[in-house]
């Protein structure tokens, strides 16, 4: 996890937790200049520690892209550093013989067409000055899918794609086909046929989704992703069979 939120240094959820308005958060965009970002050192240290792969947050929930997306101006190449930080990360990992992957947020608190007021997580969820009338979620989905296509097309082979995350609130069920998930996964599989995908197009870190049922949805992913816990006895599906999992501890 790394992005604009490294500047206030209060976690990647700082904009939501502190209900920071977009215009106030933009000061971090103006300041962002990671002069000490040296992914080659990260990759070398990871390899020496015995790690097999690395995954970077290409875009977290704040919507800031660490890659040069043609669909937004809110990206690292438009900051003082002018660098495509994702490309540097992937090249560094591959140079050390590591598998490389990218995290990509399904949520986007920067995009005007993502739900604001009443959403479970948006920084403006309690602010009636940000109603959802006039917001076109289909526009957002097209934007989001286009960015995933960029990552799957312009950055070489990806070994892991880590989507994050699905949820429900009183107004919406933000999971599965709400994300046009089958279409998204089919695109990813066509562009990156060997990639493995997590299960968060249908759940968060609190559930296992249809992989657990033995009757998986088309967008179920390849592994489950328990968060903030390492299951002491692994994870079994409803029929008692061991499941593939990766713990997400941040």
PLM features: residue spans?
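Mature catalytic domains of secreted/periplasmic carbohydrate-active enzymes
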Residues: 1-250
């Amino acid at each position: 996890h790394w992005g604009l939120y490294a500047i206030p240094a209060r976690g990647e959820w700082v904009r939501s937790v502190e209900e920071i308005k977009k215009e106030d958060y933009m000061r971090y965009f103006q300041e962002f200049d990671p002069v000490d970002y040296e992914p080659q050192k990260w990759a070398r240290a990871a390899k020496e520690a015995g790690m097999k792969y690395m995954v970077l947050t290409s875009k977290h929930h704040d919507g800031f892209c660490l890659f040069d997306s043609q669909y937004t101006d809110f990206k690292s190449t438009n900051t003082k550093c002018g660098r495509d930080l994702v490309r540097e990360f992937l090249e560094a990992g591959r140079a050390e013989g590591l598998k490389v992957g990218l995290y990509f947020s399904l949520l986007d608190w920067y995009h005007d067409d993502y739900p604001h007021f009443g959403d479970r997580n948006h920084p403006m969820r309690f602010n009636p000055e940000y109603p959802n009338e006039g917001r076109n979620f289909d526009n957002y989905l097209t934007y989001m899918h286009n960015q995933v296509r960029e990552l799957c097309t312009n950055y070489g082979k990806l070994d892991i794609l880590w989507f994050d995350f699905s949820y429900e609130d009183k107004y919406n069920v933000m999971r599965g086909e709400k994300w046009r998930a089958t279409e998204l996964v089919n695109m990813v599989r066509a562009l990156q046929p060997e990639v493995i995908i997590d299960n968060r197009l249908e759940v968060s870190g609190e559930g296992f989704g249809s992989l657990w049922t033995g009757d998986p949805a088309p967008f179920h992913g390849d592994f489950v992703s328990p968060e903030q816990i390492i299951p002491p006895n692994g994870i079994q599906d409803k029929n008692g069979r061991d499941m593939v999992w990766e713990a997400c501890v941040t």
